[in-house]
Amino acid sequence: MIDCSFEINYLIKEDSVMVLYLKKNICLESLPKIKDIMFEYLSKSINNIILNLSECSFIERDIWNYFIDFKKELNNDCYGDIVLSNMNGIVQMDYDLMELSNSIESFESLNDALYNFGIFNHTKSA
């Protein structure tokens, strides 16, 4: 049985994109908190969401299904979108196994996902 300890952090980029950092194991018990955060900002017309999964170890199938259904709602009702960034390990294998690429787009990095929404992160190099 999977330990359903989870952490969720978020930030808003340029008043148009929410980046949700899902950490540890995301199980059905974590869905109310995820929904609360997303709906708070949807009411403020922030309807583009990036799920950053760099520190996520596991996502329960019901959560994947929720994100797929919610993406359809965003596309149809709010002209928004959900994308993924920084997947690795078991989360990446599940994404591939469940053929979720047909439903939710994935980006290798957060910068790539932000660029998808027209946000350019300028990185300075020495």
Where are these regions (language model features)?
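Amphipathic alpha-helical interaction surfaces in cytosolic regulatory modules
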Residues: 28-104
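Short, solvent-exposed coil/turn elements at secondary-structure transition points
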Residues: 25, 88, 110-112
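A cross-taxonomic marker for long C-terminal extensions/tails that follow the last structured domain
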Residues: 114-126
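Short acidic-hydrophobic, aromatic-tinged amphipathic segments that line or gate anion-handling sites
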Residues: 103-113
